[in-house]
Amino acid sequence: MPVREVSRLPELNEILEKSDSNRLIIVDFFANWCGPCRMISPAFERLSMEFGNATFLKVNTDLARDIVMRYSISAMPTFLFFKNKQQVDSVRGANESAIISTIRKHYSSTPANPNAASDEEKKFLERFVGYTELRKMHTDEVFKALARSVMPDGISDRLENGEDEKKVLQELLDWFKNDFFTWFDRPTCLKCTLKCTTEGLNGTPTKEEKEGGAGRVEVFICNGCNSEMRFPRYNDPSKLLQTRTGRCGEWANCFGLILSAAGLENRFVLDTTDHVWNEVYLKKEQRWIHVDPCENTMDRPLLYTRGWKKQLKYCIAYGHDHVTDVTWRYVFDSKKLVTQERVRQGVLENFLGKLNARQMAGATEERKRELAVRRVCELMGMMVQEAKNQRIGWEKLGEDMGGRTTGSKEWRRARGELGDNPEAQVLGKPIEFRIQNDANHVEFSYDVNRDSYSQTPEKGFVAQTFECNNIQRKVENDWKMVYLCREDGKKEGNISWHFNLAPLVATDSKKTIEKVEIRMAGIRKFENGNILIIACLGDTCMRIPASGNLTIEDPKPEVLKITVTLSGGERNQAFQHAQLFRTEKDDVAEATESMVVRVYMK
């Protein structure tokens, strides 16, 4: 875990008080003017990543005087070790081996309570709490009345009169998808009518946007007239009845309110790999079914794993009075679930149990018994369906399932949700540099943050590639990192760019190419991941080193080929263990140079 700086004694006391009795707390007392403190700091950061069940803290002795006085610190650096709220050891001086030895002396890799969440697990689990508030809005009587005012006439009456629930539900889906709600990709400028091609930047919600539940807003700048366009990410479903546009989050949120208004008991399902949908309880069939308003489909739970080729991790369903894990419904083989990846299964079950109890607090005893019986039946149904799927087989199950249909093709491709799409492999043309008069060099670049190139076609990492196979652009919103890696489940990914150097000297017989500089930023390998980057020019090939920098002197004016192969890695996250262009996710206007090819002429 990252090292945390503590500035006040009450803050430190709270950490010690709340920590698990088996958790080791290490506090580094430092000063900015202290040379040994600066020397040992990188090692302290490294140790914080190595020992997961320990908390690493730093205290600036020039600022946190109350902590310094409490522990009588007189020399820097000093390291104090705490366990079960008590100081158990200390190390004075920048002695890395002594620090490691002391950590190992007191360290325990497991919490005293095996189901107690670690700090990292707590951070991950926090995301599940907010959606309980969302479901309360779906049961608001005023909101439901507003929803009924825009719905097709007679829906609720038809359900009350016993009409087939699935038939009515399909009509609702068709209406919502085709007549009511729209997909938001990028806006069209109201002034010059040009389609915006740039990514939205993070903006600050206005007072009005906040009143509609917008915690964030995407700001787009028109390429033609520089007009600003805003896309508030509204969470208030009644506001969405007015705006009637959004991405999957807005679709599932608004449709959840529509379902409640129609009298259909429903759940909001969150998938932590960035998709949401709904579930509806069919009273006659006594079962929950999958419903996706974006795709206008229902009762096709394997759509994501089999159709989109999406690797689901956690699927959590939120009813208005309960919360439950429904991941099994949406995977082909539960034995291969990767739910141990971010949080231990026992910790997840313990957390969801407490969250579910909180949601059920106002329910009657009769309702609680009903939910308990439903849950048992639901688990049995999942097991029976999985056995049936295994008999049918993976290939046959995919015959009526395709990739994702909502969103631009570039957006779906970047998310790896095109399914069995033959366009996953792209064969392009060699890139030709823009030649500027009086310039002694030309250059070409790619920015992984913006996912754009320096010349047209600009948008999407695939746009300028000569070949691209099994590669995706991965955005880690929780860690705020972005990079290229291979698609989940693929053993190898390849991407290449070809550059035609001949036109640079074709019009002037006296001009020659002096050198080519190549820079590939953010080359990262983890857990036995492999990255091979080769630059070929004519009959000569060179390996680009781990630094990502290569200079080719006196190159021939032929086709320069840069080829990247990503492979290796360990366990379920192997596809992420070889990363290209890894950088911090940044929403500011300045570009980042993930790849630069610069050609100098003489």
Curated annotation (Swiss-Prot):
Protein name, UniProt field: Peptide-N(4)-(N-acetyl-beta-glucosaminyl)asparagine amidase
PROSITE patterns the UniProt entry points to: PAW, THIOREDOXIN_1, THIOREDOXIN_2
Record-annotated PAW domain positions: 400-602
Enzyme class: hydrolase
Catalytic activity from the UniProt record: Hydrolysis of an N(4)-(acetyl-beta-D-glucosaminyl)asparagine residue in which the glucosamine residue may be further glycosylated, to yield a (substituted) N-acetyl-beta-D-glucosaminylamine and a peptide containing an aspartate residue
Co-factor(s): Zn(2+)
EC number: 3.5.1.52
Location of this chain's protein in the cell: Cytoplasm; Endoplasmic reticulum
Domain Thioredoxin: 2-130
UniProt entry tagged with the keyword Zinc: yes
UniProt KW keywords: Cytoplasm, Endoplasmic reticulum, Hydrolase, Metal-binding, Zinc
Cofactor note as given: Binds 1 zinc ion per subunit.
Similarity remark: Belongs to the transglutaminase-like superfamily. PNGase family.
Function statement: Specifically deglycosylates the denatured form of N-linked glycoproteins in the cytoplasm and assists their proteasome-mediated degradation. Cleaves the beta-aspartyl-glucosamine (GlcNAc) of the glycan and the amide side chain of Asn, converting Asn to Asp. Prefers proteins containing high-mannose over those bearing complex type oligosaccharides. Can recognize misfolded proteins in the endoplasmic reticulum that are exported to the cytosol to be destroyed and deglycosylate them, while it has no activity toward native proteins.
Molecular function terms, GO-annotated: metal ion binding; peptide-N4-(N-acetyl-beta-glucosaminyl)asparagine amidase activity
Protein source organism: Caenorhabditis briggsae
GO terms under biological process: glycoprotein catabolic process; positive regulation of BMP signaling pathway
Disulfide pattern: none
Binding residues for Zn(2+): 189, 192, 222, 225
Active-site residues, Swiss-Prot/TrEMBL: 248, 275, 292
Single GO cellular component term: cytosol
